[in-house]
């Protein structure tokens, strides 16, 4: 009896199912379609969430707060720092670097008078010393008692060389500083040099002292430039027979170097760098750190700088 009841119930359910399918012939396909659509929407939602997260991360990098960084640097660094700024965009795309290239003396004057500057790179320690608060008690190095730089950030970044460069063809057949000294004494040469308030001019004064030359007495044989770029241009244009410039500027201008000054003649040519006190110390320090990387140093060294 129980078996007959179960069999009857089974046939009854099958009959109901067939009746339902005859009444709604497309219902099975509809249910399959709805199930498929539900699966598609579920996958799309997961994908959208992942994409949103990725997009947010990407936009977070791209939309990082923009920083305008002002860098004052010696004119002799124009080519190298311009190239490095392009490289730095790959590392910090939100940082916009504005350079002010000139003689270190002029840059120091501008900074001491309140010019907006976040990072200073000088062609000599003299200008950096004059704004270093750690030297405030040394009136010879910091005569105005300025305290403008973040002392812990100060480094000796690079070393350069002072050279004797000649224009194309070397019309005076100049070969050395020794020969130049004799030509100057005889008034047989026109020499381009930097003004006394710029580092390259100050190194030249030391060279004159080394050879016992009186600059005032050589007035008719000297022509001056406000920075090393101006001196370099005078040599390139052959408006002077030779010029005392940095090795890096001679390289960048394609000039022939006939001699290099020794440390006994003018001392070391050190380029110190430091972050200035202000609102952008962190960004300035980050860029200064980048200048010490292998990538940046390879650019400096390619034109004749030596890493320190």
Language-model features: where?
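Short beta-strand-centered segments that line the small-molecule binding cleft or hinge
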Residues: 108, 114-144, 150-156
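C-terminal motif of bacterial Sec signal peptides marking the signal peptidase cleavage site
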Residues: 42-45
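Positively charged n-region of N-terminal signal peptides that target proteins for export
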Residues: 22-35
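Exported/periplasmic ABC-transporter solute-binding proteins
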Residues: 48-51, 56-86, 90-91, 105, ...
